[in-house]
From Swiss-Prot:
One of its GO terms (molecular function) is identical protein binding. Pfam families: TGF_beta, TGFb_propeptide. Keywords: Chondrogenesis, Cleavage on pair of basic residues, Cytokine, Developmental protein, Differentiation, Disulfide bond, Extracellular matrix, Glycoprotein, Growth factor, Osteogenesis, Phosphoprotein, Secreted, Signal. This is Bone morphogenetic protein 4. Its main location: secreted. It comes from Rattus norvegicus. Glycans are attached at residues 144, 209, 350, 365. Coiled coil: none annotated. Homodimer; disulfide-linked. Interacts with GREM2. Part of a complex consisting of TWSG1 and CHRD. Interacts with the serine proteases, HTRA1 and HTRA3; the interaction with either inhibits BMP4-mediated signaling. The HTRA protease activity is required for this inhibition. Interacts with SOSTDC1. Interacts with FBN1 (via N-terminal domain) and FBN2. Interacts with type I receptor BMPR1A. Interacts with type II receptor BMPR2. Interacts with FSTL1; this interaction inhibits the activation of the BMP4/Smad1/5/8 signaling pathway. Interacts with SCUBE3. Interacts with TGFBR3. Gene3D superfamilies: 2.60.120.970, Cystine-knot cytokines. Growth factor of the TGF-beta superfamily that plays essential roles in many developmental processes, including neurogenesis, vascular development, angiogenesis and osteogenesis. Acts in concert with PTHLH/PTHRP to stimulate ductal outgrowth during embryonic mammary development and to inhibit hair follicle induction. Initiates the canonical BMP signaling cascade by associating with type I receptor BMPR1A and type II receptor BMPR2. Once all three components are bound together in a complex at the cell surface, BMPR2 phosphorylates and activates BMPR1A. CDD domains: TGF_beta_BMP4_BMP2B.
């Protein structure tokens, strides 16, 4: 479980140490004067100490995020559209945007129900042709999954392949082809030349006249590679056409870039392996309903309520220089709890019996402190980011948003 209060404290401290960012939304207005005073008194000692503390704070945050070091994404890193769509569905944004986006993506309820982490992997662009029959073509390709952490238990995996419609021949509208996905069980050096030792993972009969993504279950292979630590010799794809010559086979199932195709377009059409796993911390992914962003109104001149309640605190990842590897969200409303817990405690202050007793004793004995205004309900956020290996990760982090406050 990710400690949300610790996360907020560390982000605030990082913000203090970043010098020129004191006007950012991470620090409430009431705290900015104190920050300025701290900066003024620190003098020459501040520079060396702040850099050292900042490294410690950043290391703590990265550990909370399950990262060993700060990601330094390359300019060539690509965020698959599928992962962006999953994030929008997971965070509740897609329901508001689906009419304009028109993605038609179906949320993977079953795989997500056992996972709090989704990872995506592009295949290595070295393909090995496999001898086939006159009616089929086959290729072997490889996904490097070595960046999956040891403590993450994979529950399922899927292979996504993009295929384009075939418009050749008089019967193309009624035509079908079959796509078979295999796990390669033996390396080439141990095989009889020209033959693969494989096992079938998934198969599908599809129409020629449809352009779309196809999803195949490759969980048995990925579980062997990750849980059982068996060697990863890659996957094989076989495309069989019932009424086409071999020269037309496989051209519409996109597993390699065509010469006239731009790198940007190909980056979004490459085969994609997606894993669903759980690191043992927090709850699984659950699709959220869309939430309307709260509207901020200017403070009225009337006397403010000083009792315990929730206050706005927006965490902007650009304020701590993390917007280069955190894809979404750019920030989030974390909130914080602040205010008095006066005697007698009102019902709306969401107090415990112990807090009521403590407040009662405080009313006659001031040496006993009042009950404290603290979060009573916390919720998770979803984050889409690039890890230290340039792999795209969608992850749930628990206890990041204050939903309710009370006197405890």
């Amino acid at each position: 479980m990710i400690p949300g209060n610790r996360m907020l404290m560390v982000v605030l401290l990082c913000q203090v140490l970043l010098g020129g960012a004191t006007d950012a939304s991470l620090i409430p207005e009431t705290g900015k004067k104190k920050v300025a005073e701290i900066q003024g008194h620190a003098g020459g000692r501040r520079s060396g100490q702040s850099h050292e503390l900042l490294r410690d704070f950043e290391a703590t945050l990265l550990q909370m995020f399950g990262l060993r070091r700060r990601p330094q994404p390359s300019k060539s890193a690509v965020i698959p559209d599928y992962m962006r769509d999953l994030y929008r569905l997971q965070s509740g944004e897609e329901e508001e945007e689906e009419q304009s986006q028109g993605t038609g993506l179906e949320y993977p309820e079953r795989p997500a129900s056992r996972a709090n982490t989704v990872r995506s992997f592009h295949h290595e662009e070295h393909l090995e042709n496999i001898p086939g029959t006159s009616e089929s073509s086959a290729f072997r390709f490889f996904f490097n999954l070595s960046s999956i952490p040891e403590n993450e238990v994979i529950s399922s995996a899927e292979l996504r392949l993009f295929r384009e419609q075939v418009d050749q021949g008089p019967d193309w509208e009624q035509g079908f082809h079959r796509i078979n996905i295999y796990e390669v069980m033996k390396p080439p050096a141990e095989m009889v030349p020209g033959h693969l030792i494989t096992r079938l993972l998934d198969t599908r009969l599809v129409r020629h006249n449809v352009t779309r993504w196809e999803t195949f279950d490759v969980s048995p292979a990925v579980l062997r590679w990750t849980r059982e630590k068996q060697p990863n010799y890659g996957l094989a794809i076989e495309v069989t056409h019932l009424h086409q010559t071999r020269t037309h086979q496989g051209q519409h199932v996109r597993i390699s870039r065509s010469l006239p195709q731009g790198s940007g377009n190909w980056a979004q059409l490459r085969p994609l392996l997606v894993t669903f796993g759980h690191d043992g911390r927090g709850h699984t992914l659950t699709r959220r309903r869309a939430k309307r962003s709260p509207k901020h109104h200017p403070q009225r001149s009337r006397k403010k309520n000083k009792n315990c309640r929730r206050h706005s605190l927006y965490v902007d990842f650009s304020d701590v220089g993390w917007n280069d590897w955190i894809v979404a969200p750019p920030g989030y409303q974390a909130f914080y709890c602040h205010g008095d817990c006066p005697f007698p405690l009102a019902d709306h202050l969401n107090s415990t019996n112990h807090a009521i007793v403590q407040t009662l004793v405080n009313s006659v004995n001031s040496s006993i402190p009042k009950a404290c205004c603290v979060p009573t309900e916390l919720s998770a956020i979803s984050m889409l980011y690039l890890d230290e290996y340039d792999k795209v990760v969608l992850k749930n982090y628990q206890e990041m948003v204050v939903e309710g406050c009370g006197c405890r």
